[in-house]
């Protein structure tokens, strides 16, 4: 099955979140972006919908998790090199993110994690392609 994925995340300040993720190198699909939502392009088939809390509440009757106190999701992105892992996470930290945990290095896999401006955890990993079975 081929499908696209949209991860929906509630944010306190849409403008600050857009600025933060643009600093990391992400682009936004303006067709699905307005004053209540922003469609962040992760890949051809992967997107993060950054939604104001009011907009997010339109999709659920449940309370919105405070991501600074509880983890509702851990979003993991795989990149092409260890250098890219470090570039993204270092840029995130410079833009106001906080380190979620210490870096992990298993030789064939390297990763670092950060909490974004709203406390959502983003893990950026690299895996040695020769180690991954096809």
State each model region's role.
Residues 89-134:
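Vicinal oxygen chelate
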Residues 24, 66-68, 124-125, 129:
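Membrane-topology and secretion signals of cell-surface/extracellular proteins
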Residues 8-56:
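Core segments of cupin and vicinal oxygen chelate
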Residues 1-18, 72-77, 128-134:
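N-terminal beta-strand motif that seeds the catalytic metal site of vicinal oxygen chelate
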Residues 1, 45, 117-118:
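Residue-level recognition of short loop/turn positions
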Residues 60-65:
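Short beta-strand/turn micro-motifs at beta-sheet edges
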Residues 73-90, 96-97:
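Mid-chain, well-packed structural core segment of small domains
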């Amino acid at each position: 099955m081929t499908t696209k994925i949209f991860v929906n995340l509630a944010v306190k300040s849409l403008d600050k979140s857009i600025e933060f993720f643009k600093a990391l190198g992400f682009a936004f699909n303006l067709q699905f972006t307005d004053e209540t939502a922003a469609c962040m392009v992760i890949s051809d088939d992967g997107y993060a919908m950054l939604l104001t809390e009011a907009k997010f509440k339109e999709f659920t009757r449940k309370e919105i998790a405070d991501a600074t106190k509880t983890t509702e999701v851990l979003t993991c992105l795989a990149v092409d090199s260890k250098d890219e892992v470090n570039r993204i996470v270092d840029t995130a930290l410079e833009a106001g993110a906080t380190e979620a945990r210490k870096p992990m290095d298993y030789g064939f896999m390297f990763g670092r994690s950060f909490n974004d401006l709203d406390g959502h955890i983003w893990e950026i990993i690299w895996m040695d392609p020769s180690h991954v079975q096809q």
